[in-house]
């Protein structure tokens, strides 16, 4: 495939919205050169961080440092600021004084704000000693199994890096003993059959690369994953069939 394309005129590739599997991104940098810049942001806050190819190769998995006009604040469950490498809810402040409110939704606006001008979009992560931001996941997607918090993004990163996987989403499904358990919904690569053999291969891959409690208890296969217009996986749609008839809301 590579031989059929001349990338000499390519100057920069900017990507965001959802993480790119590390193995895929590394191969693209090897192919195109250090021309890929990743951003992290939101509709509410616009662009918050940037990381170029050289930085990413040294800090693989980070989404970069805050732009000069943005401040990142990490807050624990008690509302206290976290130090370096301590995980918490991410809040942001525009140093230009910009803020937002949700249209006709004052309670939602209030819930999103720690104080005037300091807001969250529900992401969880941490800042390292050098100020690079690392995302864990969105709170809304977090799986709580037996009282333990499990973030799907880490599991998706491991499975997404397997050569037999084209796409993957990890969700929490009902478990009578633990409340939730981890399920992976996998889109197999072209020419790969989603069967028990593939389940065994992927389960072994997870055991080699993840803590035991993070490994999926089950796998389902799909032709494609439901996505929004901006490419984000619609996990609520994926969870709905498994939680139908349950008292818990998803």
Can you name each region flagged by the protein language model?
Residues 1-58, 71, 78-80:
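Gly/Ser/Thr-rich phosphate-binding loop
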Residues 7-10, 67, 165, 216:
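Core-facing hydrophobic residues within beta-strands of well-ordered domains
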Residues 17, 41, 64, 123, ...:
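Active-site glycine-centered loops adjacent to acidic/histidine catalytic or metal-binding residues
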Residues 37-43, 64-66, 171-174, 220:
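Beta-strand->loop->alpha-helix junctions that form or flank phosphate-binding loops
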Residues 56-63, 111:
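Short, P/G- and charge-enriched loop/turn segments at secondary-structure junctions
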Residues 65-69, 80-112, 150:
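Conserved ATP/PPi-binding loop(s) of AMP-dependent carboxylate-activating enzymes
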Residues 94, 100, 108-116, 122-214, ...:
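AMP-binding/adenylate-forming catalytic core of the ANL superfamily
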Residues 240-250:
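Acidic/polar alpha-helix N-cap and adjacent early helical turns
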């Amino acid at each position: 495939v590579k031989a059929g394309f001349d990338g000499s005129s390519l100057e920069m590739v900017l990507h965001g919205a959802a993480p790119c599997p590390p193995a895929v991104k590394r191969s693209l940098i090897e192919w195109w050169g250090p021309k890929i810049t990743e951003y992290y942001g939101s509709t509410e806050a616009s662009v918050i961080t940037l990381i170029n190819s050289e930085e990413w190769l040294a800090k693989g998995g980070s989404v970069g440092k805050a732009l000069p006009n943005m401040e990142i604040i990490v807050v624990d469950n008690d509302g206290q600021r976290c130090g370096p490498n301590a995980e918490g809810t991410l809040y942001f402040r525009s140093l230009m004084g910009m803020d937002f409110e949700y249209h006709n939704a004052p309670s939602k606006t209030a819930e999103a704000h720690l104080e005037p001008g300091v807001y969250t979009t529900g992401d969880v992560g941490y800042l390292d000693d050098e100020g690079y931001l690392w995302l864990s996941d969105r709170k809304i997607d977090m799986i709580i199994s037996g009282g333990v918090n499990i973030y799907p993004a880490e599991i998706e990163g491991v499975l997404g890096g397997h050569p037999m996987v084209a796409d993957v989403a990890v969700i929490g499904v009902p478990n009578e003993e633990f409340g939730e358990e981890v399920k992976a919904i996998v889109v197999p690569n072209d020419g790969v059959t989603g069967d028990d053999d593939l389940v065994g291969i992927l389960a072994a891959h997870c055991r080699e690369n993840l803590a035991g409690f993070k490994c999926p208890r089950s796998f389902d296969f799909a032709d494609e994953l439901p996505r929004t217009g901006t490419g984000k996986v619609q996990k609520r749609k994926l969870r709905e069939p498994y939680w139908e008839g349950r008292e818990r809301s998803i």
